[in-house]
């Protein structure tokens, strides 16, 4: 019924926002992102921790990001995001779930938020405008860094692990440093729990119950954060920096969360950062399709780039093209020997040249057909010189079609139908065999004459 449909739509429908609401923070975000770009000319990425409108905010505000929504998004990246506790789906992946570790690995140097965040040695305030704030992540790696070759091939992150556990495995594999995230406590069945931090530090939560879609976090009964749409993702919740004197309350309206609590070990994190940064790719020049820089490797290693793997990327080491491959089926990677090297990355879409050639040929053919048709209609071209197929395509009736009509008009009397009164049982009049044979013979003679003329030509 109409009433039932209306109630269902109200309960399950997807809401929309007004243009005024959608553009409410546009000028403020443009202001803070421009302030950053005016003062920092290096390569960096930035993303919104709180206040994002969509996965494509980076495209909207013209800043580089680790989020995207696209029907052709990289499946390997989406799977990697799932493993390390970041937002992902079939046709999108996003920054929700970023940690200090993934900020560093993915070159996310700046974080945008429409809420004030607690500062720490890891992240501090940079600029703000009209309710939009930018924080600088102080330990961000360049777009590429050297890793052990065995890591590039042998790393295994388990699907049944939460994102924090897999990030611990990842950092241990890349640097040899274990437990960058320190397990604090867990709440297997509680829907409402109170966390007392064991020490001051950056806190992260992992919700294992897949039926929980929304979690509310309140710090010291004053500051409240709500995290939505976590049901379909193996997502990490970034609570921010908390002190050991703080009280953190976590609640869910849908039952037990199976909540795990972790704290970032800053000393281990900084050691891991320094190890990777000591053999990182120093970018000298870059554009949307090209990077130029140097890297010094202490031994034979692999360079891992925080760039989604694509066949369009080519890597040149000391002027020679190197073989590229996909690390974890997601990121661009290339082997490099010990020593200091000039490394150049170039991007050109796969089959771009072939596509341009085919497009150009098609345009030429279409122009040719159009011009030929114009000349024919103007009577400047004799159609007799064209093959029969082309003539038919250009709407010039063949001789056979012409003579069928002519002979039919000459031999079928118009009075035949007039003599018939029963139109409900209309039947074709009988035409004697002699007339039929005459028609067929005439058609064959004309086709033979036409073929002889074309042969002579």
Question: What positions do the PLM features span?
Answer:
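C-terminal, active-site-flanking charged/polar segments
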Residues: 1-4, 123-155, 223-224, 233, ...
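Extracytoplasmic/lumenal acceptor-recognition loop(s) of multi-pass membrane glycoenzymes
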Residues: 2-23, 34-105, 139-165, 173, ...
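Hydrophobic, well-ordered secondary-structure elements that form the walls
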Residues: 46, 62, 111, 315, ...
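Solvent-exposed loop/turn segments at secondary-structure junctions
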Residues: 52-55, 111, 117-118, 330
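Periplasmic/luminal catalytic loop of GT-C fold multi-pass membrane glycosyltransferases
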Residues: 88-132, 138
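Active-site-proximal, structured, solvent-exposed surfaces of multi-pass membrane proteins
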Residues: 176-413, 418-421, 456-457
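Long, low-complexity, intrinsically disordered segments
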Residues: 420-457
């Amino acid at each position: 019924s109409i009433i039932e449909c209306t109630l269902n739509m109200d309960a399950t429908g997807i809401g929309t926002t007004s243009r005024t609401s959608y553009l409410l923070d546009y000028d403020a975000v443009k202001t803070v992102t421009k302030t950053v770009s005016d003062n920092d000319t290096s390569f960096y990425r930035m993303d919104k921790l709180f206040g994002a409108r969509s996965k494509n905010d980076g495209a909207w505000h013209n800043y580089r990001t680790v989020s995207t929504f696209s029907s052709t998004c990289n499946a390997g990246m989406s799977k990697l995001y799932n493993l390390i506790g970041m937002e992902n789906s079939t046709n999108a992946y996003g920054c929700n779930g970023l940690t200090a570790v993934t900020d560093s690995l993915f070159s996310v140097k700046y974080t945008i938020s429409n809420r004030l965040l607690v500062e720490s040695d890891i992240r501090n305030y940079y600029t703000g405008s009209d309710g939009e704030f930018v924080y600088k992540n102080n330990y961000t790696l360049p777009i590429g860094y050297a890793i052990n070759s065995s890591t590039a091939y042998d790393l295994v992150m388990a699907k049944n692990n939460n994102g924090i556990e897999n990030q611990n495995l990842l950092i241990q594999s890349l640097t040899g440093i274990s437990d960058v995230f320190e397990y604090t406590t867990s709440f297997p069945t509680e829907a409402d729990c109170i966390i007392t931090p064991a020490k001051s530090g950056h806190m992260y939560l992992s919700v294992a119950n897949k039926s929980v879609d929304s979690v509310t976090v309140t710090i010291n009964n004053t500051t409240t954060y709500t995290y939505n749409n976590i049901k379909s993702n193996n997502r990490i919740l970034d609570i921010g920096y908390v002190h050991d004197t703080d009280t953190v309350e976590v609640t869910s309206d849908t039952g037990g969360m199976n909540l795990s609590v972790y704290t970032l070990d800053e000393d281990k994190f900084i050691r891991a950062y320094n190890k990777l940064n000591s053999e990182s790719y120093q970018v000298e020049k870059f554009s949307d399709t090209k990077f130029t820089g140097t890297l010094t490797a202490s031994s034979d290693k692999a360079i891992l780039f925080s760039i989604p793997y694509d066949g369009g990327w080519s890597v040149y080491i000391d002027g020679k093209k190197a073989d590229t491959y996909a690390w974890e089926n997601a990121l661009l990677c290339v082997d490099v020997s010990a020593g200091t090297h000039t490394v150049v990355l170039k991007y050109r879409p796969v089959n771009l040249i072939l596509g341009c050639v085919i497009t150009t040929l098609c345009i030429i053919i279409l122009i040719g057909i159009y011009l030929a048709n114009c000349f024919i209609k103007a009577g400047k071209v004799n159609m007799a010189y064209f093959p029969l197929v082309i003539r038919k395509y250009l709407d010039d009736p063949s001789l056979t079609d012409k003579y069928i009509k002519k002979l039919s008009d000459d031999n079928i009397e118009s009075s035949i139908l007039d003599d018939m009164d029963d139109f409900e049982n209309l039947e074709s009049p009988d035409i004697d065999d002699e007339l039929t044979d005459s028609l067929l013979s005439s058609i064959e003679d004309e086709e033979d004459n036409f073929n002889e003329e074309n042969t002579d030509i």
